[in-house]
């Protein structure tokens, strides 16, 4: 509320302006016309008149001997001096005040229609709602307002905006519900992603452990082969000890044992050669290693895997052939049944034709 537009001093508190007020009965009709000229909505154009109209409605001024103290909030006025308030703070017509039930209904309707605090501040019905004594007579409304402090005039704008329309409150509640649902959905998605991330991390960790284990096995085999090759290289220069045999029988036994070992080694080399040739046929792009291009164990493993695949393929082919043969026999049976039905139909038609001829011959003979 802009008090400066109505010659109101904001340094004085509200209660200093509301003490010891007197009312002019001849101005009630003018005030009633002023309030009837405006529509009952939030804007209230009838109340917001220009400064010139407000000065015409309020010609009386404060007396010369009046003094106001902004701290104490009191005036020293003569008992017979009358003056008017600014238009926004002026008195109201106490005639035709609705009853309590009607006032409660109007208040409820104003709240549901989104009325602001300024409506209740300027509405004479709301100002007169709680200003009656026990006998039903209106009390001095200005005396009830005298309890307001100077802070009220400063924070009147915040008080005006404190009321929000009902539909706006409903929209805010719906927005809050939607935001809560979106937050819950986001939390669920975040939890699902966290669980999936933990699963992936565990899988990666297990794979890393497997890689480390395989590296360890490979390094152990490589070290063993390196040590064996080094030992053979060192011992190749050492001459073998020669022993004179005691008899020819001992010489014969040694020669026979060495021949048997050589034959066994030859058989193993033949098997390795065959496995190598098979490995070359299966996978010609084998990697070259330091101590040989092919490993017998890996080749054997590949051969076993390949043989298993071939046996599975043979089983599947046998199943397919058996299924095809069974279907072929079923098709042949169905064709034979169809031929039998056709032959039976032909035989039945021929028998009917012969019966008709015999009956015609008998009729001719008679």
From Swiss-Prot:
Keyword DNA-binding annotated: no
Thylakoid as UniProt keyword: no
Cellular localization per UniProt: Cytoplasm; Nucleus, Nucleolus
GO biological process per UniProt: meiotic cell cycle; negative regulation of pseudohyphal growth; premeiotic DNA replication; sporulation resulting in formation of a cellular spore
Keyword set, alphabetical order: Cytoplasm, Meiosis, Nucleus, Sporulation
Superkingdom, taxonomy of origin: Eukaryota
One Gene Ontology term, aspect cellular component: RNA N6-methyladenosine methyltransferase complex
Observed phenotype of the null mutant: Mutant is sporulation defective and fails to perform premeiotic DNA synthesis. Increases the rate of degradation of KAR4 protein. Decreases the level of VIR1 protein.
Region (Disordered): 28-47, 60-85
Role summary: Component of the MIS complex, a complex that mediates N6-methyladenosine (m6A) methylation of meiotic mRNAs and is required for initiation of meiosis, progression through the meiotic divisions and sporulation.
Note: Present with 3400 molecules/cell in log phase SD medium.
Summary of subunit composition and partner proteins: Component of the MIS (mRNA N6-methyladenosine (m6A) methylation) complex, at least composed of IME4, KAR4, MUM2, SLZ1, and VIR1. Interacts with VIR1.
Family: Belongs to the fl(2)d family.
Identification of the protein by name: Protein MUM2
